[in-house]
Amino acid sequence: ADFIRQHSASGQLVGRSVFLQPPYSVPETDLSVLLDVLCQDAINADITRVQGAEDVYFYSTQTMTANYADMCVQVVENDICRAIAEAVRFDGRTYPRPYKVAMLTQPPYSFESQQITAALTAMETHPDYADIRTVESSNAEPYLFSERFMSYGKAYGLCEWLEVEQYQNP
């Protein structure tokens, strides 16, 4: 549990597969029981799991939110398109606001600009991301928004305010 807490405090998940490898080398049958007990123990109530496509990941809710853990799963599993879409949809649903593309270069994502460009190109034709659209402010700062949560006009107005107009109004 402390191992998971330490990793969570530094913004990292712990994959289940870590415990199968040296130096831990916990047998599969023992590991399942151990992790189930760990997650159900009242003393370790902060330890929870999130299911990824490739592994199950563990983190402590004392230092990491479920949303951040979900973002980390997408980064660890290198699912850049899904990571971008989920970030855009989360901001649109929660705040609502468009998502600044430059934010994808920051932690927990830390994507390179080439990765972002390639992912956005792939997303343009993929049906799972049909709701994700681009919008640009008058100072040419790119943003993304989800048509599930806002129209192009609203996204444009908000990104224009964020990038230009708020600085022109005292």
Regions found by a protein language model. Give the residues of each.
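C-terminal non-catalytic scaffold/interaction domains in large multidomain proteins
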Residues: 1-170
